[in-house]
Amino acid sequence: MALACTPDEGVENNGNKNNNYGGGYRPTGKITVKGLVYGGGSTKLAGVVISDGLLCVQTDENGYFEIDSDLSRTKFITASIPSGYSAPTDENGLPIFYHKVTDEERTKDMVQHTFEFLPINNNPNRYTLIVGADPQPRARSAGYDNIAYHSLDMCEDFYRDMREKAATITDRNVYGMMLGDVVHENMSLYTDYLAGLKTLGFPMFNILGNHDND
């Protein structure tokens, strides 16, 4: 299933001694996560929401943030993508707006990370969002049943349709969102899913589905 829609139009505190945040949760315990958010070059972004999955803070006027996070429970540190900016992508077209907490960081009880976003040169409010769901690739030898996109062959058709649709849109940015079940209870096929995303030519945001977690 796929559809497309378009709207109408090393880290230091940087002098933030008073925790003068733009809003959100104020840390009261030991600081275990801190960093900066940049928006192209040396521009530091204020008011960007940063979360450890439980607590949320906003960057101050210097783009600085800190969280008193329980790193024994925290898996990722994420940043909201501020208006007027886009997230950089990896080689597969996955947007990078998060940091995975490492075992070394847990041992040290400290995460220091810098997020960097890219200014959007054209109208950031004019874009097309291509939404898909349930690619659920399975081995080519799995055969077919009543479930759509049962095999990798069907997934390739799915990716081709999205790629061809995106190619017709030249006057605005294109983004994708996959609404879960990117694989069918077989994470060994995740690399095949990524190979499909790599052909799309636009960034794909992904949401966890039950078959991805079972």
Predicted feature locations:
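Bacterial Sec-dependent N-terminal signal peptides
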Residues: 2-32
